[in-house]
Amino acid sequence: MIETIEEDKLELVREAIDTASLMRYVRGEQDGAIVAFDGFVRNQSHGRATRYLEYEAYEPMALGKMKEIAAYIHEHYRIHCVAIVHRLGHLEIGETSVFIAVSAPHRGAAFEACRYAIDTLKKTVPIWKKEYFADGAVWADGELPPTPPSAKSAS
């Protein structure tokens, strides 16, 4: 039986994410591995230069969904502890937007649980990303509006 610490760390924050402290938080003497995912702001998206990002969330529901993810990975993988922290607000290029760390006695469980956590977070947690470019902004996974027919024929 794997001993779990009293509490996983599941947070939405508006300041820089301290990834080193989260790695220390999940580490236990019974663990043999920590697997982490560090998602950060890149300087381009779909061939366009990104200036910055803004994240918004439906916070009560987002935290509830993060708790569901943590509960699932505790139930289905042999892990010790998980930290899932997502940043909200304005983020510059290179800043961490989401950090997940999973500790476990063995690396396989930690890898699988971390992968499940980020993939499920992206699909189910109500957090939205708006990308800002020199020529405008778009919500992530959204499409740019189609070019009007008159603009196409003018070119």
Regions found by a protein language model. Give the residues of each.
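Short hydrophobic/aromatic beta-strand micro-patches
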Residues: 101-103
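N-terminal, polar/charged subdomain of small-to-medium soluble alpha/beta proteins
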Residues: 1-96, 105-115, 119-155
